[in-house]
A protein has these predicted regions:
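Nucleotide-sugar donor-binding/catalytic module of glycosyltransferases
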Residues: 1-199
Length: 199
């Protein structure tokens, strides 16, 4: 009952997304909520999620990605503590893992050299990022109200809106916390993915 899952069906016609979303809403009332809309692309799906979110924090998980169950428990425990202690946290950062189809090794994006672990900090506590080390949508959980206050609105029918989602709110972030867990699993390898070079 501490988690709200919004499943946005962005006008999907090629699969059973709508039916699956409705089934989850029936099976987990009060936790899962199905949102059906005309196709607006990835950005509009995120916008719908943000418009409908009632939770303190907001995390986007794309339909072909997933989160690690053990890390998920750690994330919830951390967020719960900030809420319980009545401490404002604008951004929680976690590691993410590239789950590349056919790859023998998994690349983990972590922030150990740039951000102190398990410490509430502001920007003065952040060190220089290394080349190839960057914050992506996969690594952030934002405070919902902060996203609304900064006027975040992603463009419709546009690829690569992830960067706007991550970087537009950053000047509004006053507090952050790095939890060193491999939370988000970013799947790469589907033929029709926008990140596929042939698409």
């Amino acid at each position: 009952d501490e988690v709200e899952i919004l499943i946005v069906n962005d006008g999907s016609t090629k699969d059973n997304t709508g039916e699956i979303a409705d089934e989850y809403e029936k099976r987990y009332p009060g936790i899962c909520r199905a949102i059906h809309q005309e196709n607006g692309g990835h950005g509009e799906a995120v916008n719908s999620g943000l418009r409908n979110a009632t939770g303190v924090f907001f995390k986007v998980v794309d339909s072909d990605d997933w989160v690690n169950e053990d890390a998920y428990r750690e994330v919830l425990k951390t967020l719960r503590k900030f809420c319980h202690d009545n401490v404002t946290l604008d951004m929680l950062i976690t590691n993410f893992v590239y789950e590349k189809q056919g790859a023998k090794r998994k690349k983990v994006m972590n922030y150990r050299t740039a951000i102190p672990k398990e410490e509430l900090i502001d920007w003065s506590g952040v060190k220089m990022f290394m080349l190839g080390q960057y914050i992506l949508m996969h690594s952030v959980i934002y405070r919902t109200e902060m996203l609304r206050e900064c006027g975040l609105e992603l463009p419709k029918h546009t690829f690569y809106v992830d960067n706007i989602f991550v970087y537009q709110p950053l000047p509004h972030v006053k507090t952050m916390y790095y939890l060193d867990v491999n939370f988000y699993r970013y799947f790469i390898g589907r033929e029709d993915q926008s990140v596929n070079e042939t698409v």
